[in-house]
Structure formats: structure tokens, C-alpha cells
UniProtKB/Swiss-Prot annotation:
Protein family (similarity comment): Belongs to the RNA polymerase subunit omega family.
Keywords carried by this UniProt record: DNA-directed RNA polymerase, Nucleotidyltransferase, Transcription, Transferase
Enzyme Commission (EC) number: 2.7.7.6
Function: Promotes RNA polymerase assembly. Latches the N- and C-terminal regions of the beta' subunit thereby facilitating its interaction with the beta and alpha subunits.
Example GO molecular function: DNA-directed RNA polymerase activity
Gene that specifies this protein: rpoZ
Native species: Blochmanniella pennsylvanica (strain BPEN)
Keyword Transcription: yes
Catalytic activity field: RNA(n) + a ribonucleoside 5'-triphosphate = RNA(n+1) + diphosphate
A GO cellular-component term linked to this record: DNA-directed RNA polymerase complex
InterPro entries, sorted: DNA-dir_RNA_pol_omega, Pol_omega/Rpo6/RPB6, RPB6/omega-like_sf
Protein name: DNA-directed RNA polymerase subunit omega
């Protein structure tokens, strides 16, 4: 199971509500196949976890 702390991602985006919107939008993009993941997928991580990791690594921004 993937363990991820949301606090780092919240600091990158601004607040928890925007984080939810950005992560959900990014997860949906990956799920429907429109956009590839920007990081290597490990351990069958779900798209929401991948989206949060991309945000933490500054690969995805709020805009």
C-alpha cells in the first residue's frame, strides 16, 4: 500500500481544497488515457496516489 503525506502537496498547491481539485483532475487525465504519468508507476499505485506524488515533486501545478 502506498503511504503518502498530503502536507507536502498542500504546501505546493496552497490549500487542501485546491489540492483535491488538482489531484482529481490529474488522476482523471491519467485514467482516461489522455495524459501519461510523469513519474514511474510503482507497486500498482492508483492514479490518485500518482497524482499526489506528481504534485509533491512539482511536476503538476495549480494552473
Amino acid at each position: 500500500m502506498a503511504r503518502i503525506t498530503v502536507q507536502d502537496a498542500v504546501e505546493k498547491v496552497g490549500n487542501i481544497f485546491d489540492l483535491i481539485l488538482v489531484a482529481a483532475r490529474r488522476a482523471r487525465q491519467m485514467q482516461i488515457g489522455g495524459k501519461e504519468t510523469l513519474i514511474t508507476k510503482n507497486n500498482n499505485d492508483k492514479y490518485t496516489v500518482l497524482a499526489l506524488r506528481e504534485i509533491e515533486e512539482d511536476l503538476i501545478t495549480k494552473k
